[in-house]
Amino acid sequence: MKKIYGQAYVNISRKNITLNLERVLKSKAAKKYFTPKRWVRKKYIVDNSLHSFLNAELSKQYPNLGNSLKIYYINQKCFNDDLKKEEELYGKAKDMLSHEAIILQRGLKDGTATHESLHCLGIPHSFSERNVLFFEIAFKRNYTDNIMDYSDMYGIPTIATWEFQWYAIQRFIHALHTGKW
């Protein structure tokens, strides 16, 4: 994460916090988010309710983290209830311009946390229509080394950001730190 943000001349400080959910997971309200094997149910990631649940639990234990990006690392697989099998989901930002992202087991050892945190800051996929709207440019999917592409799945490491992304990253980080977001 530091390498990618460093390209934009942004120094990030990370604070790792362990959110103990063992007691909470025994409640009926929490059980819906997980299978009996404790796999995360995809539908609750997609509809953002798991993000909201984790935020509520985090706020109970750490009430002063409002203006922070929160990356929830969950070392579990993702389960698709409709297909009754594992979903190959690495992670998901709650929304563009949000404060939270969830990173699942598949995304723990690659650039998923950085990719999703950049979505939280409003940085779209390099190949998307949103990228055209935001930056007036888009690139062919899976052909760049940009962290916001998916080319790492095809042998091209996603190790770079581009100068036009740097300014957006800097603006959003500044807004986050000054409480203007």
Predicted feature locations:
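Extracellular (secreted or membrane-anchored) zinc-dependent metallopeptidases
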Residues: 3-13, 18, 27-116, 120-181
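Low-complexity, acidic Ser/Thr/Pro-rich "mucin-like" tracts of secreted and single-pass surface proteins
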Residues: 20-22
